[in-house]
Regions:
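A broad detector of short, well-ordered amphipathic alpha-helices
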Residues: 42, 46, 80, 116-119, ...
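Acidic/histidine-rich alpha-helical segments that form the ligand environment
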Residues: 106-140, 152-160
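Acidic/histidine-rich, surface-exposed loop or edge segments in extracytoplasmic proteins
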Residues: 27-32, 95-107
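Well-ordered alpha-helical scaffold segments within catalytic/enzyme domains
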Residues: 47, 51-52, 86, 124, ...
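Short N-terminal segments immediately surrounding and downstream of signal-peptide cleavage
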Residues: 27-46
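Bacterial Sec-dependent N-terminal signal peptides
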Residues: 1-30
Length: 185
């Protein structure tokens, strides 16, 4: 009998400690989420700049395969999509140079031009996140035939730039250069 009481007492102590942890945990506020998103965009900008600075300027025209985009074109696509997707998510006007033919313009494909457009796109996304209204994050948007929330589209914008930066890792490696180390924090 004494063992049963002791086991019951231990069980209820354990259960009580779990319940107190759960009730003392606080949910993230919208401001916390917005701050984390801004921090992630700042980190992504710094990480992408490491990629831009790792690839030699004379290799920006390099293509992993003839049918694919060059390194410069990948990064210009990233820049255009950053602005277009984030503008759609936040109902802001896109930057004046935002055009899906930007990546095909020879004048935009130099290392200096690519760095300009990419950095401008990250600054645009950072400002859009910082100035976004969390009360509107649940509003629906339709893009490319898909309906999603503004918040989800902001997240998909981040996912998209991660995907295209990641693709350029192969371009750097094929030039016998070590790509930047992963930057999770």
């Amino acid at each position: 009998m004494r063992k049963i009481i002791s086991l019951n007492a231990l069980f209820f102590l354990f259960l009580g400690s779990i319940l107190s942890i759960n009730t003392s945990a606080q949910a993230l506020s919208n401001d916390d989420i917005k701050m984390q998103m801004a921090n992630d965009w700042q980190r992504a900008k710094a990480y992408t700049n490491e990629y831009l600075n790792t690839m030699p300027a004379d290799k920006y025209s390099f293509k992993a395969v003839d049918s694919l985009r060059s390194f410069a074109m990948q990064m210009l696509h990233l820049a255009t999509a950053n602005v277009f997707l984030m503008a759609t998510a936040t109902d802001q006007s896109p930057l004046p140079w935002t055009s899906f033919d930007l990546e095909k313009r020879k004048s935009a494909q130099s290392a200096d031009s690519v760095k300009y457009y990419v950095n401008a796109s990250y600054d645009y996304c950072l400002d859009a996140v910082k100035n976004s209204d969390p009360a509107k994050w649940k509003e629906k948007k339709t893009i490319f035939g898909f309906e999603t929330t503004k918040y989800a589209l902001m997240q998909k914008t981040f996912e998209h730039q991660t995907h295209h930066r990641g693709q350029t890792t192969v371009y750097i490696r094929l030039n016998n250069i070590k790509p930047p180390q992963e930057k999770l924090f």
